[in-house]
Amino acid sequence: MSEGVLESLRAERAVSAGGRPSWRRAAWRQYRLERRMFWRNPTAAFFNFLLPLLLLALFGAVFSGRQEDLDVVVPGIAGLSVMSATFIALAYNLTFLREHGVLKRLRGTPMPASAYFTGVAGSALANVVLQLAIVIAAGGLVFGVSWPGDWAALVVFAAAGVICFASLGVALSHAIPNSESAPAYVNAVFLPMMMIAGVFYDEEQAPAILRDVAEVLPLKHLVDGLSGAMVHGEGVGAHAGSLLALGLWTAVGLVLAIRGFSWDARRA
């Protein structure tokens, strides 16, 4: 059993022994546990922090001297960072914890379910903040991408993206039967969305049918909002439609997550 599972079980026993904690204390305890588990997982740290830099280096070399293309790629990588830290991470982790019985044990403790998910989401938000800082700094200092012209819009769309993709990640975890099949399920959603949503290319260059499909994808609307704030200095109002789309996807994710989420391991 992995160190992360053992850490979760120790935390679960501590919660049970200490009686019902306050909601805030329980959420904070879960957040700290998630941070410890994250930093003890080198693979997670690599994909969260080094991979965006590698992508920036790759596309910076490919699009060297083509500033318009770099202005497209940097917000796209920022959007991918949000999705990877929330949707992908939660879908993987919740499936793993459910399969090993950790979620069922946590459900039997005095810790409220909302406190648990708040701690988990808070950890994902911390990763997003660090990733965006890395992408923005590298994009500005190394590749000459302009600094965000509207920081408020950047914060709003980043927060909307975190909430949206976190809810969708929790919802997807219910559909995944076991941790072995998690990569197939996650990549079946992530890879097509990444290719269609215009993350690495100007969407105007795509065929009309792909542009139509992209219009319904949450990643496309997140990248549009981030691009408006980071590259064009546009406020939230300029991309109100994208913010609404993220809100609608959040509602879908929350409904599916609440109605379908299971704390119990699947039967073989």
Question: Over which residues does each language-model region extend?
Answer:
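Residues that define the loop-to-transmembrane-helix transition and helix capping
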Residues: 42-43, 71, 114, 152, ...
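Alpha-helical transmembrane segments and their short interhelical loops
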Residues: 113-187, 191, 236-247, 251-257
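Membrane-interfacial helix-loop-helix junctions in multi-pass membrane proteins
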Residues: 65-66, 146, 197-252
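Aromatic- and glycine-rich beta-strand/loop motifs that create alpha-glucan
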Residues: 2-51
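Short amphipathic alpha-helical coupling elements at transmembrane boundaries
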Residues: 29, 33-37, 104-108, 177, ...
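Hydrophobic alpha-helical transmembrane segments of multi-pass membrane transport/permease proteins
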Residues: 37-66, 70-89, 188-195, 248-251
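Hydrophobic alpha-helical transmembrane segments of multi-pass membrane transport proteins
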Residues: 54-61, 70-142, 160, 169-170
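Junction motif at the cytosolic side of a transmembrane helix
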Residues: 2-14, 141, 230-233, 244-268
